[in-house]
Regions:
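Hydrophobic/aromatic residues located in beta-strands of well-ordered beta-sheets
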Residues: 73, 166-168
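A long, amphipathic alpha-helix that forms part
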Residues: 128-166
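Structured core elements
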Residues: 122, 168-169
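Short, glycine/charged-enriched secondary-structure capping and boundary segments
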Residues: 89-91, 136-138, 178
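His/Asp/Glu-rich, glycine-adjacent segments
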Residues: 2-119, 124-133
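Histidine-centered active-site microenvironments of extracellular/periplasmic hydrolases
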Residues: 172-178
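Intrinsic structural disorder
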Residues: 1-2, 178
Length: 178
């Protein structure tokens, strides 16, 4: 069972998933946080301040780093996330494969899996979350994005050996507020 930590923001949740620790331990407690060393607010997702070292901010070994001592590890996500501060803080370890769209990432993931007998893969889909934040979780756009994700996952899992374990999770839920 996976239990969401509080707060259920993308930064806090991805860091908890990546480290196995609650936000109070790994230090990535929200979208924007105060960096006491600089006495300024820094963004934990995409716009880290150059004065903040992601490995110092979140110094604990990640699940991916620990697993890579025993088997191949690959992260599949958008190209811009390959060496992002968020990745270096919370999801570092192993190799990276990328694709600009859902279907391109499915192909990249399938290729990475075909090259190894056993592996741990972290596969990130951001499109559904992005669409929900922009249009709302009850919108036709969100429904279309969910259908596209479902289709991609069906294509991806159809290629997997029958003894493959696939875990699907989200970094947070979504409720329309306006």
């Amino acid at each position: 069972t996976l239990t969401a930590a509080f707060p259920t923001t993308t930064a806090a949740s991805l860091a908890s998933l990546g480290t196995g620790l609650p936000p109070g331990q790994h230090g990535m407690v929200g979208y924007d946080v105060l960096d006491p060393a600089q006495d300024k607010v820094v963004n934990m997702l995409g716009n880290w301040d150059p004065g903040v070292d992601p490995r110092r901010w979140q110094p604990f070994p990640t699940v991916l780093e620990q697993a890579s001592e025993h088997l191949p590890v690959t992260t599949v996500s958008l190209p811009r996330f390959a060496d992002s501060a968020m990745t270096r803080a919370a999801l570092r370890g192993g190799s990276h494969a990328s694709g600009t769209g859902i279907h391109a990432r499915v192909e990249a993931a399938s290729g990475a899996l075909a090259a190894e007998k056993r592996m741990l893969m972290y596969f990130y889909f951001n499109e559904l979350d992005k669409t929900g934040h922009r249009y709302g979780a009850q919108s036709p756009e969100w429904g279309g994005s969910l259908e596209e994700l479902d289709s991609a996952l069906k294509r991806f899992t159809a290629k997997l050996p029958p003894d493959t374990l696939v875990l699907l999770t989200a970094d947070h839920g979504m409720v329309d507020t306006a």
